């Protein structure tokens, strides 16, 4: 069982709320979770041997929305109702190969993750609403300045609709060589 407070989850976007047009793109918007009604349920199965370690993990995550926005995008109120709760999930698998012929203590690690409405399990440490990167210059020919913005959401809904969960996947790998 894992704590599901706001700091431990990605936001939920009520796209019907009146907010600056740049809000969705800059990551500055109201988190529309309706509170914490259930912890996340997590588990894993792990095999640890001399030559390899393998692990399969999973998580179930409740998405509980705030009330629908009123006419013209005004603040949500109880009489407007809200979308039904939905459950998001994550599935992760990992493999680490040890005792490699490249040298003592060398390891090759690989993992893959799929999420549907539980983005924090894909990009750990989601503690806000966005990722922003700004660059004053690059070494690439023809480029001037750069900017990247990524809003990490568990889902999106509008007035009268259901929650559309965010889906994502990730693949990571690493090689440790002892010199």
Task: Please place each PLM-identified region on the residue numbering.
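Aromatic- and glycine-enriched pocket-lining scaffold segments that form the walls
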Residues: 1-89
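Detector for outer-membrane/organellar transmembrane beta-barrel domains
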Residues: 50-179
